[in-house]
């Protein structure tokens, strides 16, 4: 009988794509997937390790499986493999800390999972740690992959890694330097997905605005280089190529870095009707003191000008962003400036996080760490402000006619809403799933709309 494998996928959409690739390779090798852990010969946990909360969720998921094996809820001889960012980040420590785990793999070993499982089952492994140094792997259009998203929406990972050195972020140390796929390869994957019925292509990477820059030959890009198709493939040239594909679909931009935006990129979004009027631009703060300490290579005036230019060039666009509160050295003046900025720009979609002190980052050893009570208070103040603005934004939509993509019976999303991140729209049950529809908003509670 073929081996049966269960998989738990944690973390972001980029990690979800890695899970899809693992499943694709397992199926190609003749193994069977199961959603029921108690029936699995092998359990795989694809982990996140971005912040403390993600690490704890990953450890809890691993230990839940260990306890289930011990108390008889899962097979006693079931094997456990830990994959993803937690394994990569703590590759030296985890084998000793988690002796119950049968193998550890990182992002570079996801295509080798079937062979590793075979070795684990045959008890031929010499070392439980299969992770080999820095990450270099990048998928291509033909990579075996079983999509875990609804049939009408898909993620395309256009690059891996990150060349930024944000003081709070561990990702470059986990995922390695930025590595772009070719534009032809991305377009080919998109064409295949659209032919299969996909209506929404979500472009993802650690930083999609850096796309193509690592392949430029005229001069080496830096952390402030702007999107520029005259120097080679870029996000702007990719959007134009994707927009030219036949069919009715959205192209959604997630994970852009403000430092790389250019007039060309803004113009490409405005000129391409298939690009959703939605951009994700994590700003993190507005105070120059904080932006400098975070090493975001931007400043407050630059950010304000960028936002005004985007809204002027692309009327009706939704700007999604995130902020960090309680970063080391943040003063009450810095916090107040952030609050006033949020009030002034009234982002269509926004989230806030308290600073997570991550060992291995530059921020970990910074002086003037903010007390946890102060962080919590500032977080609560910002959350209340964002909630009020969300309510006001929702009320402004009542009476408007909007285009939605139906995700499930009675549930849809607008152009302003990314899957599993933003809001939803309650729509008539008769609307066909996986198709676009035009509806009129009749009620709103924050980002959650009702329409008919």
From Swiss-Prot:
SMART domains: Elp3. GO terms for molecular function: 4 iron, 4 sulfur cluster binding; aspartic acid methylthiotransferase activity; metal ion binding; protein methylthiotransferase activity. Residues 395-452 form the TRAM domain. It holds the Pfam family TRAM_2. InterPro entries: Elp3/MiaA/NifB-like_rSAM, Methylthiotransferase, Methylthiotransferase_CS, Methylthiotransferase_N, Methylthiotransferase_N_sf, NA-bd_OB-fold, Ribosomal_uS12_MeSTrfase_RimO, rSAM. Residues 148-392 form the Radical SAM core domain. It comes from the Bacteria. NCBIfam families: 30S ribosomal protein S12 methylthiotransferase RimO, MiaB/RimO family radical SAM methylthiotransferase. Belongs to the methylthiotransferase family. RimO subfamily. This is Ribosomal protein uS12 methylthiotransferase RimO. Residues 3-122 form the MTTase N-terminal domain. [4Fe-4S] cluster 1 binds at residues 12, 48, 85. [4Fe-4S] cluster 2 binds at residues 162, 166, 169. Its cofactor is [4Fe-4S] cluster. The keyword Iron applies. Catalyzes the methylthiolation of an aspartic acid residue of ribosomal protein uS12. Binds 2 [4Fe-4S] clusters. One cluster is coordinated with 3 cysteines and an exchangeable S-adenosyl-L-methionine. Its main location: cytoplasm. GO terms for biological process: tRNA modification.
